[in-house]
């Protein structure tokens, strides 16, 4: 069952806004529904593009976002998903459409260099308040493809 707040996340791609900020309790399902909506939006609007999936660390991002997404039955039914752990890239295909979701960790002030120079069509930043400002600003700046959108989740610290 989808809650009214989760329905708003699913509707975000069709809004006039360029950014979504989700705030909610831990284990409320916001990250899972955001990732589903993020990938669905990317696959419906782009092909051959790169997207950022950002967490505090690459490992936490992999465990909390990538692995649950690849295990999601709806995702497995709709897409061909290939997770290349060594490259930190999840390749998602459906028909002639292929997009790449690159995982980044924003754990310290030097982390911005990991995303610097990339061109992204969108980014999802999970638990963004735990990331240094320099990393967040660099991720936002990298979203320079026309039509790019930002997806951010907050936690209370």
Regions found by a protein language model. Name each.
Residues 1-155:
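Phosphate/NTP-binding elements of NTP-utilizing enzymes
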């Amino acid at each position: 069952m989808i809650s009214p707040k989760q329905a708003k996340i699913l509707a975000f791609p069709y809004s006039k806004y360029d950014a979504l900020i989700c705030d909610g309790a831990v284990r409320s399902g916001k990250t899972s529904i955001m990732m589903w909506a993020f990938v669905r939006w990317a696959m419906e609007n782009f092909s051959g593009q790169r997207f950022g999936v950002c967490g505090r660390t690459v490992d936490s991002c992999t465990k909390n976002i990538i692995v649950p997404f690849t295990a999601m039955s709806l995702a497995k039914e709709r897409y061909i998903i290939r997770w290349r752990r060594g490259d930190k890239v999840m390749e998602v295909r459906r028909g002639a459409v292929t997009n790449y979701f690159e995982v980044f960790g924003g754990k310290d002030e030097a982390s911005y260099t990991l995303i610097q120079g990339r061109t992204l069509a969108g980014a999802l930043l999970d638990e963004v308040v735990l990331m240094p400002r320099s990393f967040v600003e660099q991720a936002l700046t990298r979203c320079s493809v026309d039509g790019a959108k930002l997806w951010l989740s907050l936690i209370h610290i």
